[in-house]
Amino acid sequence: AIFFEKEMIEVLRTVDTEGKVIGQFCCNNGRELLSLVKSGNASKGVGFDIAENQVAFANEKAKELNLPCIFEAVNVYDIDDRFREQFDIVIITIGALCWFENLNRFFEIVAKCMKPGAVIVLNEQHPCTNMLATEGDAEFDPEHKMECHFSYFEHEWTGNGGMYYMTLKNYHSKTFTDFTHSLSEIISGMCNNGIVITGLKEFDHDISGGFSSIDHRGYPLSMILQGNKQ
């Protein structure tokens, strides 16, 4: 199975993965990277995630499926020079950027791990959703779901809820801090670290699980950003 959104699959088909080394930051349980390495006939996949249980599961799956993938339990900021200029392709998917307050620092690490000329494909929630309230927010109005309640530029919040990656079921978690980012923050973080933007696609359908009730109503809900390291 290919565990990507339809539009992401279409973009990845334009990227030559055969014999290449693919890296994924905030890979969760590894299913996306495993499926891409297998379907794209890549030579190797490397995934990073801070959650040790998810990484253990991913490594077990890689062994079970006999795929050339390794997964490391590490804070992205602590990724060492073993991975300097190792990746031909980098993928970043939904739910990664919100864990990082400083995207310039995040993309500095990402760029360090990319070979010159390497490709990056980022599939994330659209930054315009930063302004919307979701069910559970005090501001949420089921009659006016597209009403903007928050600043596009500043929105940091803490929570105790999460969503299972495989089942989309909600659960109670330890308190965490979540950071939202404007499109300019994301693009600048890449450009400041030698990544040239080569494509941007925007979509009016949700990939986060929080805004599907306003799918296809003209509001930007998700995006794919592509780049190359100089």
Residue map of PLM features:
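A short acidic, Gly/Pro-enriched loop at the edge of an enzyme's catalytic core
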Residues: 81-90
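Residues lining the SAM
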Residues: 92-94, 123
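Conserved alpha-helix/loop element of class I SAM-dependent methyltransferases that forms part
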Residues: 1-20, 35
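A short glycine-rich, Lys/Arg-flanked "PGG" loop and its adjoining helix->strand segment in the class I
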Residues: 104-119
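C-terminal lobe and adjacent flexible extensions of AdoMet/dcAdoMet transferase-like proteins
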Residues: 185-230
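A short His-aromatic
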Residues: 98-99
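Class I SAM-dependent methyltransferase SAM/SAH-binding core
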Residues: 21-79
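SAM-dependent methyltransferase
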Residues: 117, 122-188
